[in-house]
Amino acid sequence: MADVLFFEKPGCRNNTRQKALLIASGHRVEAHDIRQQPWTAETLRPYFGDKPVAQWINPAAPRVKAGEVRPEALDESEALALMVKDALLIRRPLMAVGQTKTCGFDRAAVNAWIGLIAQDPGDIETCPSQATNHRCAEEPGAA
């Protein structure tokens, strides 16, 4: 069993499902609102490891969907500066277990890292609202 520090956007359906899967797998989850953290470039950077910069950005963020932010055009410092100012741009969830940190919820990677139960909950990485105009009920206009 792992103690998972889990940064989410409350009301996000996938974050809710991801936490439920972690708990069902025997892990303890300490959830925090990603928007309420005092992020800096230095505190954010370790969560992204060697992932390409474009994968650091939440593709369902309103500014990405509107074309205002183009993840593939950003370098590391630009991406970090944008995410520090607008936490909705951060790919969720951010998770930490001990000194190991990661972003997103690739089920196979999380299973290899801390272990998950065998049930298949379906796609819990891609925002189900991304292909529609649906907004999460928790906060209109926020992804």
From Swiss-Prot:
Q: Which SUPFAM superfamilies match?
A: Thioredoxin-like
Which InterPro entries does the protein's record reference? Answer: Arsenate_reductase-like (IPR006660), Nase-assoc (IPR006503), Thioredoxin-like_sf (IPR036249)
Q: Which domain of life is it from?
A: Bacteria
Catalytic site residues? Answer: 12
Write down a Pfam family by its short name.
Answer: ArsC
Q: Which family, according to UniProt?
A: Belongs to the ArsC family.
Against NCBIfam families, the record matches this protein to: nitro_assoc
State the name under which the record lists this protein: Uncharacterized 15.7 kDa protein in draG 3'region
